[in-house]
């Protein structure tokens, strides 16, 4: 994409109402613009990152055996009255009436809807187990929306729901999602630590939240130094309950807790390996058994023909929030540093002198070759000062920058910069092309 044809309204100054780094950088990098309190329009650069995050999450959900569907944003109040949560949920739920005076709500969560949907379309215990998920925008009327997409009123969520005939099978599906979340966050370039959590209004007796360490996190977290080791993708047989349980056990054996769940005994055992930091919740999973199936009459005939209440779990990832968390965990004084897996473009190509015929010929040719090789490239072909072009590329955080200037063009060389390390090297155009395409083929 040529930057001269792109919509990238970068800002030199940070708006006064932006308090945390992710909010500041998303505004300055032209990723979002606020349209109302806690509600944002996603501009082309921000939307590309959202889509890349969605793709990874979809792949890991499918690997764990989940099926994608899509539920509407509007729900009937009657569904929530079935579960008993309509009056209990509070003012965060936006309630409306249609022209026929029917009560509706803008879904803050989907347990009731998915329960009714699956209840009315399964016939027997042989139809289980099942995991369904969807990715949809939600609305919660936060009393004080702040911190940009980290605590907005409208946000994009991935919600999954599991359905099982007994608790043993239900915990197997819980472990499927536990491992799928570890792999999702690892692929996104994040170290997410699973921590035992309260179930809150969702309910149930088993819950973990996944916390990303970040200096500007929203809460204190305490953890064993083993969690500072590099993350890795977990090769798992999702159909093997014992193997999955072993993986889960390995990942909860080292101490990690939020401030509310601290354990003085385990902290004493950790000794000088105990660490304290700030963290951001990016995922939350629950196993709540029959909390929704019983009041909503969701039973299926078991092997003996007798009705059995269905065991359920729910599993959420805040996708728009996750984007903010990635920035909080990966930035410097000059801007964002995107992990390669989610970067909106892989390469930022800078032509320092568009009026120089040699520069333009080399830049145009390299741009066309990179695009043909499947390398997403943002080509800065604007008639701007070099300093402004460098600042823009550092701000938006693309993994690689290729700089073409008049002196280098005469010699057939370019400057290649790695955004994360800051390392620069002067190499031939051909070597730069080979390096960038080789890295693409390895991913």
UniProtKB/Swiss-Prot annotation:
Molecular functions per Gene Ontology: ATP binding; proline-tRNA ligase activity
EC number(s) from the headed UniProt entry: 6.1.1.15
GO cellular component, one term: cytosol
GO biological process, one term: prolyl-tRNA aminoacylation
Swiss-Prot/TrEMBL catalytic activity: tRNA(Pro) + L-proline + ATP = L-prolyl-tRNA(Pro) + AMP + diphosphate
Compartments reported by the entry: Cytoplasm
Assigned keywords, A-Z: Aminoacyl-tRNA synthetase, ATP-binding, Cytoplasm, Ligase, Nucleotide-binding, Protein biosynthesis
Assembly, per entry: Homodimer.
Family affiliation: Belongs to the class-II aminoacyl-tRNA synthetase family. ProS type 2 subfamily.
Functional note: Catalyzes the attachment of proline to tRNA(Pro) in a two-step reaction: proline is first activated by ATP to form Pro-AMP and then transferred to the acceptor end of tRNA(Pro).
Entry protein name: Proline--tRNA ligase
Organism: Zymomonas mobilis subsp. mobilis (strain ATCC 10988 / DSM 424 / LMG 404 / NCIMB 8938 / NRRL B-806 / ZM1)
Gene: proS
């Amino acid at each position: 994409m040529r930057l001269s044809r792109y919509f990238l309204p970068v800002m030199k100054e940070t708006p006064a109402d932006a308090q945390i780094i992710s909010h500041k950088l998303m505004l300055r990098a032209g990723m979002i613009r606020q349209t109302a309190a806690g509600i944002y329009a996603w501009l082309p650069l921000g939307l590309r990152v959202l889509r890349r995050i969605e793709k990874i999450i979809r792949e890991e959900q499918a690997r764990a055996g989940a099926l994608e569907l899509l539920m509407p944003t509007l729900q009937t109040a009657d569904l929530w009255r079935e579960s008993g949560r309509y009056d209990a949920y509070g003012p965060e739920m936006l309630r409306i009436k249609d022209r026929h005076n029917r009560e509706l709500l803008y879904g803050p969560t989907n347990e009731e809807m998915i329960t009714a949907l699956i209840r009315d379309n399964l016939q027997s215990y042989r139809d289980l187990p099942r995991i369904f998920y969807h990715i949809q925008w939600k609305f919660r009327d936060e009393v004080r929306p702040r911190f940009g997409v980290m605590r907005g009123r409208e946000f994009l969520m991935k919600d999954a729901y599991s359905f099982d005939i007994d608790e043993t099978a239900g915990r197997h599906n819980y472990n499927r999602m536990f491992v799928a979340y570890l792999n999702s966050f690892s692929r996104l370039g994040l170290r997410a630590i699973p921590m035992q959590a309260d179930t809150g209004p969702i309910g149930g007796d088993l819950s973990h939240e996944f916390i990303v360490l970040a200096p500007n996190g929203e809460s204190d977290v305490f953890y064993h130094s083993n969690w500072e080791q590099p993350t890795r993708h977990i090769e798992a047989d999702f159909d093997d309950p014992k193997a999955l349980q072993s993986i889960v056990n390995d990942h909860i054996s080292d101490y990690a807790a939020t401030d509310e769940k601290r354990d003085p005994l385990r902290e004493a055992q950790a000794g000088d390996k105990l660490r304290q930091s700030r963290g951001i919740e990016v995922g939350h999973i629950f196993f709540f058994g029959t909390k929704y199936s019983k009041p909503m009459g969701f039973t299926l005939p078991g092997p003996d023909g007798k009705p059995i209440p269905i065991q359920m779990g729910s599993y959420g990832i805040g996708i728009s929030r996750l984007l903010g968390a990635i920035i909080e965990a990966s930035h410097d004084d000059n801007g964002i540093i995107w992990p390669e897996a989610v970067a909106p473009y892989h390469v930022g190509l800078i032509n320092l002198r568009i009026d120089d015929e040699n520069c333009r010929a080399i830049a145009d040719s390299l741009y066309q070759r990179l695009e043909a090789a499947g390398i997403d490239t943002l080509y800065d072909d604007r008639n701007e000062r070099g300093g402004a072009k460098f600042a823009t590329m550092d701000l938006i955080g693309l993994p690689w920058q290729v700089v073409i200037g008049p002196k280098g063009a005469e010699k057939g060389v370019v400057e290649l910069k790695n955004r994360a390390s800051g390392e620069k090297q002067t190499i031939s155009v051909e070597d730069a092309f080979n390096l960038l395409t080789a890295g693409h083929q390895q991913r």
